Amino acid sequence: EKKLNFIIENKIIYVADNIGYLYAINYLDKKIVWAKNYKKPFRSNLKITQDDLLVADQDNLLYFINKYNGNKKKNFPTEEVILKNNFYNSLANDDNNIFFLNTFGSLYSIILKDKKIQWFVNLNQSLDLSTNSLFYSNPIIINKNKIIVSSNPYLYILEKNSGLTKVKFLIDSIIKPISSGQKVFLVTKDQLLVCIDEDSGKVDFSIDINQETSNFLGTKNKKTLKAKMISIVNDELYLFLKNSYVIKVNMGGKIQQIDKLPAKLGTFPIFINNSIVYLNNKNRLIILD
């Protein structure tokens, strides 16, 4: 099955797939800007810096790509993993660094200017730290001077400049958490929406999504819902469900609104101005105004 990851900058969509193709498309003109075949399946999200497109392959090799022509500028080899699970390499960046969490469980901070490693730390809790050990995490989050990593079974909050652990909390999330700046929001396997203070690691609130949805709709039977993704827009939480519904929740954990999307989510939605952009489960681009 073909799997796509994409990122948008200005009017260009950059796409990487699990076959090894990397390409740029002008979505306004609907024309291909460039296309390259790197012949290794890509296995990460994409990030953009001033001149570079960053992506990692299935062997945990991190690429710096010229975003204007698709040519490789530099790569970073990291630990390979023989066995694969559902975890993809995760990239995040700020103005000065790219942060790379690979499928071995190692988190790297790489300085963008000179493309050198600033620090790295391994978060794999397996007793067998070998290329056969499996590590799972949600995509990493950068929040000011912190890095948030939601792995199985721990939530880590680390100092961005040093990699030192500030918070280590025994909780795992079935989706990528989201940070408001002071709080991190996640969803557990029991469909609990949990809010955790990023400085203290204490739980601010925990609500049962199924029960609260039933209460909001005024139904007696408890709903059986499954969360897919979560976002923050205009200081409100948007909880996207696998059944194509979206629940809008305020920062105190109260449901405000429930709506239905016209097509199922295939990728994490991107919010651009007043529009929501995502790929559906058939890899078709959906733009909602």
What are the functions of these language-model segments?
Residues 1-8, 31-50, 72-95, 116-144, ...:
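Extracytoplasmic beta-rich repeat domains
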Residues 26-30, 66-70, 111-115, 159-162, ...:
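Short loop/turn segments that connect beta-strands within beta-propeller blades
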Residues 13, 22-25, 53-54, 65, ...:
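Fold-core signature of tandem repeat domains
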Residues 17-18, 50, 57-58, 102-103, ...:
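Structural signature of WD-repeat beta-propellers
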Residues 162, 236, 241-289:
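C-terminal closing repeat unit and adjoining cap/tail of repeat-based domains
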Residues 23, 63, 108, 117, ...:
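WD40 beta-propeller blade core
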Residues 98, 139-150, 157, 236:
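Extended non-catalytic domains of envelope/secretory-pathway proteins
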